[in-house]
Amino acid sequence: LGGSTVIPEVSDAMLQANNAYIPLLELQEKAGGMIADLVNVPAAYVTSGAGSALTLATAAVMAGKDDKKIEQLPDTTGMKNEILIQKRQRYWYDRCLELAGAKLVEFGSVQKTLPEDLFNSIGPNTAAVHYFVSASEEDRRNLSLEQTIEIAHARDIPVLVDAAGQVYPLDNIGAYVRMGADFQCVATKYINAPQSTGLALGTSEMIRNISYQSFVGYEGRRVRGIGRPHKVDRQEIVGATVALRHW
């Protein structure tokens, strides 16, 4: 909670950004393209922390590109609003999913999660399946991410991955999207970026829908999504991008 320490290259880049003006829609697009290329994923977006990325991604899977639904959130009446999560994977930060208006639905037991637990839990209101990746050794009593993706995608359900702290080895950044997940968040405070920044990595459709929910989308498109408080300034966008490049 004391904050991260940015490296000199990041602070220098942020200072340069402080003295220049650019439309944030354009800056997010350029930064996202650079980040996506660096980690070999289809698309990326700089957010106000990994928790923000989780909230925006949850809103994105519920509302998509429908402006009426975007403005309706966090009221999810008439929408698919259920996010499935393994009972064994409930954790401190899954609250970020509920902030968008979603309802968390547990599957499996505290002892073990089986493939059929997920299969049988998918219903008409399922918006996505959430998966938490921890730094510890893989727990074989959990349903694996590979199995989760296979089962969910067979029913056209997107998979969201919280891998906020998985920044080492370096290949972890973007690994879960490359594996087939639709979204992965990264907390860039762990890579010498400003503590208040994070990354949303994912498919082009997912990141586009996240952008519609964002602060930039709210002001630039004049569509009132839930992301207005999730502001990222140009200095932070540049700082996070440069930090990733050096990491």
Residue ranges and their predicted role:
Residues 1-6, 31-47, 51-245:
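Conserved PLP-enzyme active-site core in the AAT-like
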Residues 15-27, 153, 160-163:
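An acidic intrinsically disordered interaction segment
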Residues 1-23:
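Glycine-rich phosphate-binding segment of PLP-dependent enzymes
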Residues 11, 28-32:
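Hydrophobic face of alpha-helices
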